[in-house]
Design a protein with these regions (language model features):
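A structural preference for short, hydrophobic beta-strand core positions in alpha/beta folds
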Residues: 38, 90-93, 142, 185, ...
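A short acidic, amphipathic alpha-helical/loop segment
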Residues: 22-23, 104, 128, 170, ...
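Structural beta-alpha unit
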Residues: 1-2, 26, 43, 60, ...
């Protein structure tokens, strides 16, 4: 069963931290998390701009900045998880080039999962979520502002590749820990240009042919990989707007307390998922739903 036992959580002392921590507190058991490294990355140990004045007043001027930051993070973590948190964790305040340090820590700690805010890891650091996604070698969870509810619905876009198999297996592992959670498979059927219907298969219902082909492919996908149909509510949508990311987002938004799990790479139309327009649109436009990218 897939789990994310060791995770690195990038925090930047902004309001986004609260949403990340509350999401993890609500869903740590669902995800199988055992150890968390809460990391704040600083180019140098000067007082971060995000730390408010009231927080600064709590400490004497000679109090080392890294200790101030560590205590602030400790307070926020305790507030989210409670004083007797079952999750084992450590707090690390690291000086150096944030982007390189983050990738280094992922490797050193053998992290199964990196958790970041939806758009940026650290305000002003130059580490965008997209940049980390391109280079981090582990699974990545993007948590948006207000995306911290307890997960009830898991939306898994599929293209029937091995990469989407990893995504559905992650969803099944979540469901095994929380049986009441629902898995919604989603395949967006790409349609040819409108004039294609006038010059190919006239009167044959080409949309129906494409939809039927997609369902046959799904049947083979389920059979070949020994998946349980009972656990997956499969959905097929036509890409009428020629916007796969938009269809995925709209579908997921219809499900209360939902998250999206996607494979890191797949075949058409997802063949450049992390490195092409679909992933970038997902990261940039989905502002209220957690997005988990599995490798």
């Amino acid at each position: 069963m897939q789990s994310f036992r060791r995770i690195i959580v990038a925090l930047d002392l902004s309001e986004a931290d609260r949403h990340i921590l509350q999401f993890l507190a609500a869903n740590a058991a669902l995800m199988g998390i055992e150890k968390a490294y809460f990391v704040h990355l600083m180019p140098d140990f000067t007082l971060p701009k995000q730390v408010d004045v009231e927080f600064q007043k709590l400490f004497a001027p000679e109090y080392p900045v890294d200790e101030k930051v560590r205590d602030k993070l400790g307070f926020d973590i305790q507030e989210a998880f409670g004083e007797e948190a079952e999750l084992e964790y450590s707090i690390e305040v690291i000086e150096g080039k944030p982007y390189e340090k983050l990738l280094h820590w992922i490797k050193v700690k053998e992290a199964d999962l990196l958790v970041v805010g939806k758009k940026e890891v650290s305000q002003g650091s130059g580490i965008t979520a997209r940049r980390v996604a391109r280079n981090a070698k582990c699974n990545i969870l993007f948590v948006p502002v207000n995306g911290y509810s307890e997960i009830e619905n898991i939306v898994v876009p599929l293209d029937f590749s091995n990469h989407s198999l990893h995504a559905i297996q992650a969803a099944q592992a979540f469901k095994a820990r929380k049986p009441e959670a629902d898995i919604h498979g989603l395949y967006v059927v790409d349609l040819p240009p409108e004039d294609y219907y006038t010059r190919s298969r006239p009167g044959k219902g080409y949309r129906g042919v494409l939809m039927e082909s997609a369902k046959i492919a799904y049947d083979s996908f389920v059979k070949d990989n020994g998946l349980s149909r009972e656990e997956i509510e499969m959905n097929f949508l036509e890409n009428k707007q020629h916007d796969i990311a938009g269809h995925i987002e709209d579908f997921a938004l219809e499900k209360p307390h939902s998250m999206i799990i996607m494979g890191a790479r797949g075949h058409s139309p997802f063949e450049t998922f992390l490195f092409g327009s679909i992933s970038e649109k997902m990261v940039e436009r989905v502002n209220v739903l957690p997005l988990l990218v599995v490798r």
